[in-house]
């Protein structure tokens, strides 16, 4: 009699799944962590809510109202979740029938869209971006049949550029009555003028993902948002966990979204943008750097000579970057988070010493 292993009992798509390679999962023994697009220094908060004997609100009122005011939308258009990553998954769970519907995304881009779909058993379709990393609208149009959710990251991770707003409008017209278009705005605080939040009234099928992990310097909090029209939010509320935010998370999130918290965030953005421009200028003068791409974010994508050797050399010196070689069209590319001036200098000095 054949023995059935525990793995044999698992769903086939889970057995075949490659988990998302997060920065922490990839590890390393660094002291300069520039691989996860985090804010480089600690922002201090004090807990004010001590009612830990009680379950929290499903959608904490102070968090929802503060975020709605910050984003310029109505509270009914906001859903808070465990990071934007949960928002990615909720949209698939609410709109895609496993084994029947598909999602579509445009690589090179963020890796969680495919992981979330594959976990749920939903087909992934890809339409690689054009040479300038803008949308291939004809390619998308050709593949839309059976697609229920389209993910577009803008500014795009890992390339750092904004998607042309006219292309977004064309995509929203192409998908009207057919699919939800999800604009992933995890990095929008670094270029707030480009947000699509003002478009919600025009497009009932638009959803926008946001996070406190980047400019708000709270990656360890795991708090993100979905902005959408009330009909979409109500559907997501059917599939979200009953208590997605713990009481301490809601407490700190509400503080971060207070008027003082918003001012502090904008000061951090100004500082990071100045540091980004310093690092870009320095990288352009280094011999092992072939090309530095423009960025609207808190990270820089650059193409290197012998990028694997450079990546390993810096890794061995405790400087952890993000290797993008496996992404379509990113051969030779490494992504560098903008950190402190001291961290930038460590990177610059290490790269100048490379004999490539």
From Swiss-Prot:
What molecular function terms (GO) are annotated for this protein? histidinol-phosphate transaminase activity; pyridoxal phosphate binding
The PTM N6-(pyridoxal phosphate)lysine maps to 214
Q: Which PROSITE patterns match?
A: AA_TRANSFER_CLASS_2
> Biological process GO terms, please?
L-histidine biosynthetic process
Pathway connected to this protein: Amino-acid biosynthesis; L-histidine biosynthesis; L-histidine from 5-phospho-alpha-D-ribose 1-diphosphate: step 7/9
Q: Which UniProt keywords apply?
A: Amino-acid biosynthesis, Aminotransferase, Histidine biosynthesis, Pyridoxal phosphate, Transferase
Q: Which reaction does it catalyse?
A: L-histidinol phosphate + 2-oxoglutarate = 3-(imidazol-4-yl)-2-oxopropyl phosphate + L-glutamate
EC code(s) of this entry: 2.6.1.9
Cofactor(s) it depends on: pyridoxal 5'-phosphate
Q: Which InterPro entries match?
A: Aminotrans_II_pyridoxalP_BS, Aminotransferase_I/II_large, HisP_aminotrans, PyrdxlP-dep_Trfase, PyrdxlP-dep_Trfase_major, PyrdxlP-dep_Trfase_small
Which Pfam family, just one, is annotated for this protein? Aminotran_1_2
The UniProt entry's sequence similarity note says:
Belongs to the class-II pyridoxal-phosphate-dependent aminotransferase family. Histidinol-phosphate aminotransferase subfamily.
Q: Which PANTHER family match?
A: HISTIDINOL-PHOSPHATE AMINOTRANSFERASE, HISTIDINOL-PHOSPHATE AMINOTRANSFERASE-RELATED
Q: How does it assemble?
A: Homodimer.
Alphabetical list of NCBIfam families matching this protein: hisC (TIGR01141)
**Entry protein name:** Histidinol-phosphate aminotransferase
Instruction: Name the source organism.
Output: Escherichia coli O81 (strain ED1a)
Gene that this sequence comes from: hisC
């Amino acid at each position: 009699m054949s023995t059935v292993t525990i793995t044999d009992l698992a769903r086939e798509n889970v057995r075949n799944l490659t988990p998302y390679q997060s920065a922490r999962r990839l590890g390393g023994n660094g002291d300069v962590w520039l691989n996860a697009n985090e804010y480089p220094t600690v922002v201090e908060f004090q807990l004010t809510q001590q009612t830990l004997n009680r379950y929290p609100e499903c959608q904490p009122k102070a968090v929802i109202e503060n975020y709605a005011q910050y984003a310029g939308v109505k509270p009914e258009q906001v859903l808070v979740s465990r990071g934007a990553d949960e928002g990615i998954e909720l949209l698939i769970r609410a709109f895609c029938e496993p084994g029947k519907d598909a999602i579509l995304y445009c690589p090179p881009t963020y890796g969680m869209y495919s992981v979330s779909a594959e976990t749920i058993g939903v087909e992934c379709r890809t339409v690689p971006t054009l040479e300038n990393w803008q949308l291939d609208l004809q390619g998308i149009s050709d593949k839309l049949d059976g697609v229920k959710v389209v993910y577009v990251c803008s500014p795009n991770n890992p390339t750092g550029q904004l998607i042309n707003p006219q292309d977004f409008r064309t995509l929203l017209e192409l998908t009207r009555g057919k699919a939800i278009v999800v604009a992933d705005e995890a990095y929008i605080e670094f270029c707030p003028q480009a947000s699509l939040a003002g478009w919600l009234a025009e497009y009932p099928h638009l959803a926008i993902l946001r996070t406190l992990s980047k400019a708000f310097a709270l990656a360890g909090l795991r708090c993100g948002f979905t902005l959408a029209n009330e009909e979409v939010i109500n559907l997501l509320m059917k599939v979200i966990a009953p208590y997605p935010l713990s009481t301490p998370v809601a407490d700190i999130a509400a503080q971060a979204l207070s008027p003082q918290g918003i001012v502090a965030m904008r000061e951090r953005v100004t500082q990071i943008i100045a540091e980004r421009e310093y690092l870009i200028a320095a990288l352009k003068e280094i011999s092992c750097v072939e090309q530095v791409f423009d960025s609207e974010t808190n990270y820089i994508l650059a193409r290197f000579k012998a990028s694997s050797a450079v990546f390993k050399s810096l890794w061995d010196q405790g400087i952890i970057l993000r290797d993008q070689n496996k992404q379509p069209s990113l051969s030779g590319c490494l992504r560098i988070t903008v950190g402190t001036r001291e961290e930038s200098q460590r990177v610059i000095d290490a790269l100048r010493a490379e004999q490539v």
